[in-house]
């Protein structure tokens, strides 16, 4: 019977150029008799039979690869059988000329069916020296099907060294797709654009166009996104493309490395474990930090209203009720040193605690993080900065410096950055909260530079200058944290110095604001501690100093510190 099967195999191969249907019948006759005839299963694959059972049988009998063909002295490459290994990345096939190739096709099929663990188990048993890149590629296919994007990147990050330049190009697509799904849109755009020019560009054109469109839309480049979507709708129409064309707010559903790592079942994207205790902790920390702030009564009240409105909106939405959708972006105005950055951290904790943003992340930035030196580069630089803040809060201190006045001329680089920021604030409004901060008059000037900017901010919080008494209270807190204490005389000297600055104007602003308010209090405490230490260092027997004397900042220490700090700040009379 073995001779008969070999003869049937030889006949089936010879019929391939003339009648694939007849060849398929002969290959099927062989497998009906002997399910372990691996070569015949591959013949069926060559004839278009890529059923899951066929792929499984070919893989299950892979140890018999080459037996039938060898018995009639036919090379398996003669069949020209190819198997799909592209997964969601592209229409990629691979020649079935080895047991490893069979395993690759089987793994791709199982991953598409959701049998990720089986696919990975088959690949783990398959490594062949010199073919590690093939296994790495297939693992990226399996991980991609399971939406384990961080693992995809791990598998393809060394693809530049792969000997197969086609698969190396496809790996660039996989890297770009993973980056897009992790909301790293600038990186996704770079990877996908490079991959489009690689040998795999044509085979992966569909995936490249879709994810590049989603990346560009999220970056505010709607016209480029629409152009790609229209090409897809013409060449590869499908419901999601039509939906994205119809609705400009259509976005890629992204995730984070933390969410992937928190899955109860690593292969199930829906098994992300929500730890509400963590959210409750964030809310408690936010409230505690808010309570610790000295003064800021109006600010605290506004933050409480912001928190209440956000909470109730989520409660109403959960019950299917209509919810107003005011912008969550905020403006903080006031002089330096009045707690704006601290309150921004409080807001980040509140929003993360309420589940509005993914994590209590505050990315602190200024003009240098947005504005480049060459035309066209500010948009790229701004996009990268915004990508870092996705899922959290982007805090822009001295935001008025984004667009600078140049002898009455516009600042093209700053305007480019601002336009990009404005688009992303709208496009990423569900994943990004922007807080801009600075002096009230300067922020108003910034808002006038773009018609749509003011409307992006629904909440504006004014930070008042601290009173001298509040600054003294802050100074006492700072000192206590350093195991120091102000004597009554030191406190009085501090208070009088602060009152003098409160009454003075310097460079068109209140001197206390120029000094930095809370920062001024910290500078005086730190300088007075240095003066105290210098004084105590003159004691003949240092070992006799008790804790009270080591802790005490006296009137002369504070007076000397005031003179030094005022000189440094150029505030002397």
From Swiss-Prot:
SUPFAM superfamilies named among the record's database cross-references: P-loop containing nucleoside triphosphate hydrolases (SSF52540)
A Pfam family that the UniProt record links to this protein: T7SS_EccA1_N
Listed GO biological process terms: biological process involved in interaction with host
InterPro entries: AAA+_ATPase, AAA_lid_6, ATPase_AAA_core, CbxX/CfxQ, CbxX/CfxQ_RuBisCO_ESX, P-loop_NTPase, T7SS_EccA, T7SS_EccA1-like_N
Molecular functions (GO terms): ATP binding; ATP hydrolysis activity
Binding positions (ATP): 334-341
Protein family per UniProt: Belongs to the CbxX/CfxQ family.
Protein's recorded name: ESX-1 secretion system protein EccA1
Originating organism: Mycobacterium tuberculosis (strain ATCC 25618 / H37Rv)
Gene: eccA1
């Amino acid at each position: 019977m073995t001779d008969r099967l070999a003869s049937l195999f030889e006949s089936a191969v010879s019929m391939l150029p003339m009648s694939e249907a007849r060849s398929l019948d002969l290959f099927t006759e062989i497998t009906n008799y002997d399910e372990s005839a691996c070569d015949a299963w591959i013949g069926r694959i060559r004839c278009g039979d890529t059923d899951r059972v066929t792929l499984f049988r070919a893989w299950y009998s892979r140890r018999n690869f080459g037996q039938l063909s060898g018995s009639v002295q036919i090379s398996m490459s003669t069949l020209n059988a190819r198997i799909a290994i592209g997964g969601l990345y592209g229409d990629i096939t691979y020649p079935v000329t080895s047991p490893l190739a069979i395993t690759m096709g089987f793994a791709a099929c199982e991953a598409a069916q959701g049998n990720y663990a089986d696919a990975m188990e088959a690949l783990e048993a398959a490594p062949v020296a010199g073919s590690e890149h093939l296994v790495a590629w297939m693992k990226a296919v399996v991980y991609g099907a399971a939406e384990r994007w961080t693992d995809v990147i791990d598998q393809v990050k060394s693809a530049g060294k792969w000997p197969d330049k086609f698969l190396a190009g496809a790996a660039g697509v996989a890297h770009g797709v993973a980056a897009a799904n992790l909301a790293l849109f600038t990186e996704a755009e770079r990877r996908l654009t490079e991959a489009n020019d690689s040998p795999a560009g044509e085979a992966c054109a569909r995936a490249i166009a879709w994810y590049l469109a989603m990346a560009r839309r999220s970056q505010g480049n709607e016209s480029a996104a629409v152009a790609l979507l229209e090409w897809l709708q013409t060449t590869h129409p499908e419901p999601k493309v039509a939906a994205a064309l119809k609705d400009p707010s259509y976005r890629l559903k992204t995730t984070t490395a933390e969410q992937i790592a928190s899955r109860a079942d690593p292969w199930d994207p829906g098994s992300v474990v929500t730890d509400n205790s963590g959210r409750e902790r964030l809310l408690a920390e936010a409230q505690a930090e808010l309570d610790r702030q000295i003064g800021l009564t109006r600010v605290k009240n506004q933050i409480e209203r912001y928190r209440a409105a956000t909470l109730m909106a989520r409660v109403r939405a959960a019950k299917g009720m209509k919810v107003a959708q005011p912008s969550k972006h905020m403006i903080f105005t006031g002089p330096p040193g009045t707690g704006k950055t601290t309150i921004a951290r409080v807001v980040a904790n509140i929003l993360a605690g309420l589940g509005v943003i993914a994590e209590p992340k505050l990315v602190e930035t200024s003009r240098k993080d947005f504005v480049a030196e060459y035309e066209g580069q500010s948009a790229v630089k701004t996009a990268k900065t915004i990508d870092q803040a996705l899922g959290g809060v982007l805090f822009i201190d001295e935001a008025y410096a984004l667009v600078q006045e140049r002898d009455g001329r516009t600042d093209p680089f700053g305007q480019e950055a601002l336009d990009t920021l404005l688009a992303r604030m709208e496009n990423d409004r569900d994943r990004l909260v922007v807080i801009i901060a600075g002096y009230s008059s300067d922020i108003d000037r910034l808002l006038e530079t773009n018609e749509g900017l003011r409307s992006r901010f629904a909440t504006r919080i004014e930070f008042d200058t601290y009173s001298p008494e509040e600054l003294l209270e802050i100074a006492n807190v700072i000192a206590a944290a350093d195991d120091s204490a102000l004597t009554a005389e030191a406190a009085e000297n501090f208070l009088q110095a602060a009152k003098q600055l409160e009454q003075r104007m310097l460079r068109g602003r209140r001197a206390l604001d120029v000094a930095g308010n809370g920062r001024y209090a910290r500078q005086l405490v730190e300088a007075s501690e240095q003066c105290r230490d210098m004084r105590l260092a003159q004691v003949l027997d240092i070992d006799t100093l008790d804790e009270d004397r080591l802790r005490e900042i006296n009137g002369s220490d504070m007076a000397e510190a005031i003179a030094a700090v005022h000189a440094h700040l150029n505030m002397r009379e």
